[in-house]
From Swiss-Prot:
Residues 597-741 form the N-terminal Ras-GEF domain. It comes from Homo sapiens. This is Son of sevenless homolog 1. Interacts (via C-terminus) with GRB2 (via SH3 domain). Forms a complex with phosphorylated MUC1 and GRB2 (via its SH3 domains). Interacts with phosphorylated LAT2. Interacts with NCK1 and NCK2. Part of a complex consisting of ABI1, EPS8 and SOS1. Interacts (Ser-1134 and Ser-1161 phosphorylated form) with YWHAB and YWHAE. One of its GO terms (cellular component) is GTPase complex. Residues 444-548 form the PH domain.
Length: 1333
């Protein structure tokens, strides 16, 4: 005797890996078939897979050996009517299997596994049958869940959605959870909280669109599920009978679809400048057409006295009950109890229109829209008064709320209110046990009092979608101290998925009764006080029981209609845009989640892209924006206009031969089809063509400015458009064109209003109007930074997306295609070179230190203003070869300024990681660094092909364009917010006209800068050369604090105190002796004596990355700086002219300094007295100095090097450069930007692309430091004196290739810590190794 086989465990450790994930890809395909506009996450599909395997286990337990065995098991196990539909699908699959595989689930993989499950081999046809049943159930689950997800206005199906939706479906709950007492669907509090507070106009419109979509589905249910059986059986029900029951429901459906279409079109074509969609005209147009009149006659018919009796008389006709029962189980009860409630829904919906119009009029911010809404309200006054008169007589007696008439649960409304209501009811019931109501129910339906027949006890009933709770009232009963104050006491509860509702006829024992039959065949009978009360309870109970069945009937009906009523389109030979989709003309993204249910295009022909740009079935605003930004890379503007005009002119489909014969016989077979074609194809396509035109002229008018004929053609085309629906869109486009023309002729007018007045302009040595005196040291550093920021912000905001797509700024017509971008690149180049020139042309060491210090102060204000482009311009100048090598200059920069410079440099490290984090953390206005965007665009353009080949056809790679458009979109998000700063026209003009190169060629100029750098600080000099002073005015900085701070204006826009980084302010001493002394008012130079201990400067420069109070633009009340008093009157170079305040009265004055002697044994240049002597014709030579035992730290940290002996890395990356002169130099690099200045670490032309090294960048000349031990590199000995006059500059390597291999420039750090006290009169010599000769 054969041993009985053990049951197969699908989820055991041994078997689970064989099944896990097997069905997920196919289930994704099934989901795409039932809801193509939604997506499913992996958890959801895995959960459906578990349910399907659970179902497979149930089917296999019957040990089927034939298809009839499986069918018998389905009939016994599956609830009605799903068993009938599943069997029909399975039989159809077996028939189709003979020709091809119609199934999505993998039959070929499941068939061999079934042998292992059953223990014996079965016929392949049986496997097909089983898989077909499984696929039908999976499609049913996903269809149900998709409907729920769309109701709550989501676009992705989750595991939680499946649990919630299945809990509301009695059929599926019976199938999968027959033996489970209650299912925990998780509390709805996990979902999004409902929006509270006052709704805006746009909120009202969005909510109404969701409501009307659900309302249209209800109307479809009434017409296609309930009305159709009456219409199709003319023997039982005459046309007059149908009219008496359903009145003008078809007209109401047509109006609702038309209204929704108008509102969707209006929302789609709303101007970006408009405060909200202007839907008033939608209501006004329909109201003037009297389109709402059917509601009044409908309400009169449905609410007239005796309607319910005449309705019941139709159902009591001989054969009527049997006919309705034959349609489906429970259908007769649904018609009797559910249909009358559904027929009231249009009445309540119409009353809602009147309330909505008043709310929209109140919230509207557009005067024209307000007027339209007012006109619509006036036009509907007759309908409103008629409706209110009818309803006041009939609905008042019914005392029904609108929710009682709703067939579908309102998941999108008041989730939190539903949870709150459930919790309140549960708290009011004494003796509650088990899970909370909110864990097994989604919504509260109704409550009331019923009598339990037999015991004749009154019970207070609470009905939810998942539970029916019967309670006894606690009123009137004496309560013991400490007893519960609950109003009700629990008697019993019924799970709605486990009961059957049975109508009971009136008898002598009870009247107005119904029966609840439990699973164990026991039953409970409840009776109501009146027939109307019974009807209300039965309507709610029957709706809960048969809702899923009725929804499935609606889905099946609508699917059949779609298949039968496919719209006839013109021939592709006549109308190119009617060509069917195929892999030869369009490809969609597979792994990208579509937004709002719209597929995302990966590649396509131009014709298909234009078709989807103006698609009749949906609008895709993102695609419109992306297309108009990027189309120039594959299509010219004139071609695009020709294509959209061709798209607009749609021919009607030609009649077939059968149609011609029917027309000859006097029939009109095409009239209905043509009406539908015009309504569902021509009108939406033409509206979307106009929408594209509006976006084009609004956001890309430069196409028309460059081509007058293009604008002429557009205006001619718009002038030919006719039709009432098109009128307002034509007017809108015409107004935009006129506005753009005026702006083009008169120049753009910027009327920007700020909440507070901009800060006053800061002046230093130069005065307004004296532009000839403007220079780096004569202008105020704050105002230099402000005016440069305003200028760079204007340049940044002027760059159009079309200047970037296709890397057109690197190509031949770049002056035409990228004028604004080139302006910005050239300005960046000029400013960086100007900074370099200012530094190296300042020969005197003290003055040069002041210049560098002033530039760092400008950088600090750039940081405060969030001008990242300016910050990296300064970093670029400091890291250029001529400046980077100036060791002696950087040694005298205060450590705090070095820290600022280093932190600015860190922004560009690690692929600009810190910069990107900082950019995301601040609020506009700001000026981002453009180089990153250009680098990303260039990599995207070069790393992706222009076309994709499919079946020998070349398709435009639109995915590549979308990626570029995403980058340009990021650029645009920072182009909207202007700076609240005052333009100083003279300073602005000074920087606009900067031309540091003069008439020199770039190579010549960069050679000059480097040679000048070698002249002022030669390589390994014996003594450092001395030079006379260049400037006659004081070098002392005015600081970076506004001179006249006042509330609201003393701070720059968007101070960095909002940054997430919180570093407390602490002063970094220059040396051990300086740790007790404060910083001077200007960079430490030989002219600056050490300040008194404890004194601080108004110009102390702190890190812009410090804490909230590190900003130098705070008021004096919260500053971290000690007050400094400066003398009034003319400045003097005398040390005694500077007074520092310490405490209240103590003002230390340094003693007078004796004049310096001229002999060679004189002290080092570090003595202030030497420089202060004004009577010396030429500076004396600097004598050698004893070498110090300590080494200076490098300007950048060397902690990351692999070994201390390794050569240091090259200087940091530079911001962008673009040539100022001679167009022929543009082609000298792969990107056609400016070639590198000689000796730089990185060429300026390639600096906008920091991660793309150019093969044309020569290595920088080596600049050995005079401090050999600090570099950890061997220094070549000096064999002879260096003659400065004989230096002609370093050897210049060829641009393309070179045989010389010049080593890279070693890095420096801005954290130079002095190993000796700060410079003062008696300090040590300036140079190390001064005595080595």
């Amino acid at each position: 005797m054969q041993a009985q086989q053990l049951p197969y465990e699908f989820f055991s450790e041994e078997n689970a890996p064989k099944w896990r994930g097997l069905l997920v890809p196919a289930l994704k395909k099934v989901q795409g078939q039932v809801h193509p506009t939604l997506e499913s996450n992996d958890d959801a599909l895995q959960y459906v897979e578990e349910l399907i395997l659970q179902l497979l286990n149930m089917l296999c337990q019957a040990q089927p050996r034939s298809a009839s065995d499986v069918e018998e098991r389905v009939q016994k196990s599956f609830p009605h009517p799903i068993d009938k539909w599943a069997i029909a699908d399975a039989q159809s699959a077996i028939e189709k299997r003979k020709r091809r595989n119609p199934l999505s689930l993998p039959v070929e993989k499941i068939h061999p596994l079934l042998k292992e499950v059953l223990g014996y081999k079965i016929d392949h046809q049986v496997s097909v049958y089983i898989v077909a049943v499984l696929e039908y159930i999976s499609a049913d689950i996903l269809k149900l869940v998709g409907n729920y997800v769309r109701n709550i206005r989501h676009y992705e199906i989750t595991k939680q959605d499946i649990k919630v939706a299945m809990c509301a479906d009695k059929v599926l709950m019976d199938m999968f959870h027959q033996d489970v007492e209650d299912i925990n669907i998780l509390s709805l509090t996990d979902e999004e909280p409902s929006t509270s507070g006052e709704q805006t106009y746009y909120d009202l419109v969005k909510a109404f669109m969701a409501e009307i979509r659900q309302y249209i589905r209800e109307l479809n249910l009434i017409i296609k599920v309930f009305r159709e059986p009456f219409v199709s059986n003319s023997k039982l029900f005459s046309a007059n009978d149908v009219e008496n029951i359903f009145s003008r429901i078809v007209d109401i459906h047509e109006l609702s679809v038309k209204l929704l279409g108008h509102i969707e079109d209006t929302v789609e074509m709303t101007d970006e400048g408009s405060p909200h969609p202007l839907v008033g005209s939608c209501f006004e147009d329909l109201a003037e057409e009297l389109a709402f009149d059917p509601y009044e006659s409908y309400a009169r018919d449905i609410l007239r006295p005796g309607f319910h009796d005449r309705f019941l008389s139709q159902l009591s006709k001989p054969g009527a009950a049997l006919y309705l029962q034959s349609i489906g189980e429970g259908f007769k009860e649904a018609v009797q109890y559910v249909l009358p409630r559904l027929l009231l829904a249009p009445v309540y919906h119409c009353l809602h229109y009147f309330e909505l119009l008043k709310q929209l009029e109140e919230k509207s911010e557009d005067q024209e829209d307000k007027e339209c809404l007012k006109q619509a309200i006036t036009a509907l006054l007759n309908v409103q008064s008629g409706m209110e008169k009818i309803c006041s007589k009939s609905l008042a007696k019914r005392r029904l709320s609108e929710s009682a008439c709703r067939f579908y649960s309102q998941q999108m409304k008041g989730k939190q209110l539903a949870i709150k209501k459930m919790n309140e009811i549960q708290k009011n019931i004494d003796g509650w046990e088990g899970k909370d109501i909110g864990q097994c129910c989604n919504e509260f339906i109704m409550e009331g009092t019923l009598t339990r027949v037999g015991a004749k006890h009154e019970r207070h009933i609470f009905l939810f979608d998942g539970l029916m709770i019967c309670c006894k009232s606690n009123h009137g009963q004496p309560r013991l101290p400490g007893a519960s104050n609950a109003e009700y006491r629990l008697k019993e509860k019924f799970f709605m998925r486990k009961v059957q509702i049975n109508d009971k006829d009136d008898t002598n024992e009870y009247k107005h009764a119904f029966e609840i039959i439990l699973k164990d065949e026991n039953s409970v009978i409840f009776s109501a006080k009146s027939a109307e009360e019974k009807n209300n309870w039965m309507a709610a109970l029957i709706s809960l029981q048969y809702r899923s069945t009725l929804e499935r009937m609606l889905d099946v009906t609508m699917l059949q209609e779609e298949k039968e009523e496919q719209m006839r389109l013109p021939s592709a030979d006549v109308y190119r845009f009617a060509e069917p989709d195929s892999e030869e003309n369009i490809i969609f993204e597979e792994n990208m989640q579509p937004k709002a249910g719209i597929p995302i295009i990966k590649a396509g022909t131009v014709i298909k892209l234009i078709e989807r740009l103006t698609y009749h079935m949906y609008a895709d605003p993102n695609f419109v924006r992306t297309f108009l930004t990027t189309y120039r890379s594959f299509c010219k503007p004139q071609e695009l206009l020709s294509l959209i005009i061709e798209r607009f002119e749609i021919p009607e489909p030609e009649p077939t031969e059968a149609d011609r014969i029917a027309i000859e016989n006097g029939d009109q077979p095409l009239s209905a089809e043509l009406k539908r074609f015009r309504k569902e194809y021509i009108q939406p396509v033409q509206l979307r063509v106009l929408n594209v035109c509006r976006h084009w002229v609004e956001h890309h008018f430069y196409d028309f400015e460059r081509d007058a004929y293009l604008l002429q053609r557009m205006e001619e085309f718009i002038g030919t458009v006719r039709g009432k629906a098109m009128k307002k869109w034509v007017e809108s486009i015409t107004k935009i064109i006129q506005r753009k023309k005026i702006a083009r002729d008169n120049g753009p007018g910027h009327n920007i209003t700020f909440q507070s007045s901009p800060p006053t302009v800061e002046w230093h040595i130069s005065r307004p109007g004296h532009i000839e005196t403007f220079d780096l040291l004569t202008l105020h550093p704050i105002e230099i930074a402000r005016q440069l920021t305003l200028l760079e912000s204007d340049l940044y905001r002027a760059v159009q997306p079309s200047e970037l797509v296709g890397s057109v700024w690197t190509k031949e017509d770049k002056e035409i295609n990228s004028p604004n971008l080139l302006k910005m690149i050239r300005h960046t180049t000029n400013l960086t070179l100007w900074f370099e020139k200012c530094i190296v042309e300042t020969e005197n060491l003290e003055e040069r230190v002041a210049v560098v210090s002033r530039i760092i102060e400008i950088l600090q204000v750039f940081q405060e203003l969030n001008n990242f482009n300016g910050v990296l311009e300064v970093v670029s100048a400091m890291n250029s070869s001529p400046v980077y090598r100036l060791d002696h200059t950087f040694e005298q920069i205060p450590s705090r300024q070095k820290k600022i410079l280093e932190e600015a440099h860190e922004l560009s490290e690690d692929h600009y990681k810190k910069y990107l984090a900082k950019l995301r953390s601040i609020n506009p206005p700001c000026v981002p660094f453009f180089g990153i965007y250009l680098t990303n665009i260039l990599k995207t353009e070069e790393g992706n092909p222009e076309v994709l080949k499919r079946h020998g056809k070349e398709l435009i790679n639109f995915s590549k364009r979308r990626k570029v458009a995403e980058i340009t979109g990021e650029i645009q998000q920072y182009q909207n917010q202007p700076y609240c700063l005052r333009v100083e026209s003279d300073i602005k003009r000074f920087f606009e006209n900067l031309n540091p190169m003069g008439n020199s060629m770039e190579k010549e100029f960069t050679d000059y800068l480097f040679n000048k750098s070698l002249e002022i600080e030669p390589r390994n000099p014996k003594p450092l050369p001395r030079f006379p002073k260049k400037y006659s005015y004081p070098l002392k900085s005015p600081g970076v604090r506004p001179s006249n701070p006042r509330p609201g204006t003393m701070r720059h826009p968007t101070p960095l105190q909002q940054e997430p980084r919180k570093i407390s302010y602490s002063r970094i001493p220059e040396s051990e002796t300086e740790s007790t002394a404060s910083a001077p008012n200007s960079p430490r130079t030989p002219l600056t004596p050490p300040p008194a201990s404890g004194a601080s400067s108004t110009t102390d420069v702190c890190s812009v990355f410090d804490s909230d109070h590190s900003s130098p633009f705070h008021s004096s009340n919260d500053t971290v700086f000690i007050q400094v008093t400066l003398p009034h009157g003319p400045r003097s170079a005398s040390v005694s002219s500077i007074s520092l305040t310490k405490g209240t009265d103590e003002v230390p004055v340094p003693p007078p300094v004796p004049p310096r002697r001229r002999p060679e044994s004189a002290p080092a240049e570090s003595s202030p007295s030497k420089i202060m002597s004004k009577h010396l014709d030429s500076p004396p030579a600097i004598p050698p100095r004893q070498p110090t035992s300590k080494a200076y730290s490098p300007r950048y940290s060397i902690s990351d090097r692999t070994s201390i002996s390794d050569p240091p890395e090259s200087p940091p990356l530079l911001p962008p450069r673009e040539p100022v002169r001679t167009p022929d130099v543009f082609s000298s690099s792969p990107l056609h930007l400016q070639p590198p200045p000689l000796g730089k670490k990185s060429d300026h032309g390639n600096a906008f692309f920091p991660n793309s090294p150019s093969p044309f960048t020569p290595p920088p000349p080596q600049t050995p430091s005079p401090h050999g031990t600090r570099r950890h590199l061997p220094s070549p000995p000096l064999t002879q004196e260096v003659d400065l006059h004989s230096i002609a500059g370093p050897p210049v390597p060829p641009r393309q290739s070179t045989s010389q291999h010049i080593p890279k420039l070693p890095p420096k750090t801005y954290k130079r810590e002095h190993t000796h006290p700060s410079m003062h009169r008696d300090g040590p010599p300036l140079l190390e190794n001064a005595h080595s000769s």
